[in-house]
Amino acid sequence: GIDTDSFIAVTDTKYEGFVPGEIKTAAVPADMVEGINIMDNSTVTLVLYDKDVNGNHKDFAHVVGDFNNWTLSNDEKSQMYRDDASGCWWITLAGLDAGKEYAFQYYVGTKEGEVIHLADAYTEKILDPDNDKDISASTYNENLVYPKGGVGIVSTFKIQKDSYNWKYNDFKIANPEQLVIYELHLRDFTASSDINGAMGKLSYLKAMGVNAIELMPVQEFDGNDSWGYNPCFFFAMDKAYGTKAMYKQFIDACHEAGMAVILDVVYNHATGNNPLAKLYWDGDKTAKNNPYFNVEAPHPYSVFHDFNHESPLVRKFVKRNLQFLLKEYKVDGFRFDLTKGFTQTSCTESTASNYDA
């Protein structure tokens, strides 16, 4: 398996000479969550959590994107407010087009010269300057144009999300204790290596007596060619297999055929392209002050960057992600990868399977 990060090399000259202004403070508007908040048909509030294990935060946070022509400024178009009570930076963007997809990223850092170009961890779609160009139009027939102002991976949002009319809103597994599960990797299952190909083989699976399909990880992972155990954006489905609508069509078709859909999910670790890792980084690993990750895994199954599963922030993130997948995609269950890594107790190969209360 892959166990090294696949970083996108970038050279940042676009914002040379920009001097961030003094921090402006204001309380985060009521009922906001971290990430992208749709307020109305023309307004979005972006919320970025930034409070390390020592209670400190970055010295500045701005946002750049299609909505401000990728231009940094110390005003309401780019500079984020700071709310120490919540530990968040935030900004409300007005005058947006409800039907337009906007690309954006955060620009955060310190007075000592640290600058981080950060996508939103909660985005449902990323644009990747290195890998999107290799995805065929037959697999992904929606916008993949990378913005000229971006630096590395960028996130997106759209106020008026594309609707999908589910045929099966309340699918129930007929015999949950008698599942015949087929573990399916979309890349390897058919010649087209995507959802379109898998859709054409559902009758084959049904004829074999399969009543549940377990999709190997489909949340956005580094690159396009992987088993998926190198996740980076947990709320975005990987575009190498298809669009959001195609994923929903596949799940709907499975339900129509009487087959449940189980997602293989990876919450033991994330790659360095994950924004929660990238925000607090040191050399080639997560920094000691990162509130989401361990510097080194306490267990012997270390791959990529190990989540601190006792962190309230991690538990909140995982719970929110699972709820999102259930509601947005109507999946029927989950297979949790590498659960022996869900620990903060130091262990070895011989003790890793011990009960950990």
List the predicted regions and their residue ranges.
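Core domains of carbohydrate- and sulfate-ester-processing enzymes
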Residues: 104, 108, 112-168, 276-296
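Surface-exposed loop/turn motifs at beta-strand-loop junctions within extracellular Ig-like
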Residues: 1-2, 108-110, 219
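Aromatic-rich carbohydrate-binding modules that target alpha-glucans
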Residues: 46-99, 109-131
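Exposed beta-strand face motif in extracellular beta-rich ectodomains
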Residues: 1, 100-104
